Regions:
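Short beta-strand/loop motif that positions the catalytic acidic residue
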Residues: 49, 54-57, 61
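Primarily recognizes the serine-hydrolase "nucleophile elbow" in alpha/beta-hydrolase
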Residues: 1-49
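Extracytoplasmic/secreted proteins, especially bacterial periplasmic and envelope-associated proteins
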Residues: 2-6, 26, 77-81, 112, ...
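C-terminal catalytic histidine-bearing segment of alpha/beta-hydrolase fold enzymes
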Residues: 87-161
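Extracytoplasmic/secreted cell-surface and envelope-processing proteins
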Residues: 38-42, 63-65, 105-107
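Acidic catalytic loop of the alpha/beta-hydrolase fold
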Residues: 60-65, 70-72, 103
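Gram-negative outer-membrane beta-barrel domains
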Residues: 62, 78-85, 89-94
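Alpha/beta-hydrolase-fold catalytic nucleophile elbow
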Residues: 31-34, 56-57, 99
Length: 161
């Protein structure tokens, strides 16, 4: 998920790394499961002409920031941050936000949300609809989990000894 988002962001902003792509190259759409952007130069921004995005993310993800985690302009910017940026820039997206769900959304949508993924491809990619949709989902039987993490906690989760 990070690779797909990062590639589209680099292409959208005309970064040097993206210049290996043909000049008229454009991703038809991006499906991101618990992904984020990595930036060493402050807050990343998409333009309104970025590819439409389907963003899945759980609010209790301690592996990849749901919103953002940064120190001195270096950080990861997750699905909530990306959706807010695309809203400001009139970019097309569908943001599936799952309350109290952790990093399991890095894989489960590919099995459990096939209908939603196919509908996104039909509506946003094939038919070219320019929509901004946010679905906030909560399993009322699921236990509440932490939803705020420090940079140190993200590092500890990802780099256990």
């Amino acid at each position: 998920a990070i690779t797909a988002l990062q590639a589209e962001w680099l292409r959208d902003k005309g970064a040097e790394l993206a210049k290996v792509l043909p000049e008229d190259f454009r991703y038809a759409g991006v499906v991101s499961c618990a992904g984020a952007l990595f930036s060493t130069k402050g807050k990343p921004k998409f333009s309104g002409s970025a590819a439409p995005m389907l963003l899945f993310h759980g609010t209790s993800d301690s592996n990849v920031p749901y919103n953002k985690a940064s120190v001195m302009g270096i950080g990861f910017y997750g699905s909530k941050y990306i959706a807010k940026n695309l809203t400001k820039e009139d970019g097309a997206y569908y943001f599936y936000s799952a309350e109290y769900v952790d990093h399991e959304l890095a894989g489960t949508p590919l099995f459990e949300q096939c209908d939603l993924i196919m509908q996104f491809i039909t509506d946003y990619v094939l038919e070219g609809e320019r929509l901004q949709t946010t679905a906030e989902v909560r399993d009322i039987n699921a236990p509440r989990k932490p939803t705020r993490f420090t940079v140190k906690e993200y590092l500890a989760t990802n780099y256990k000894r």
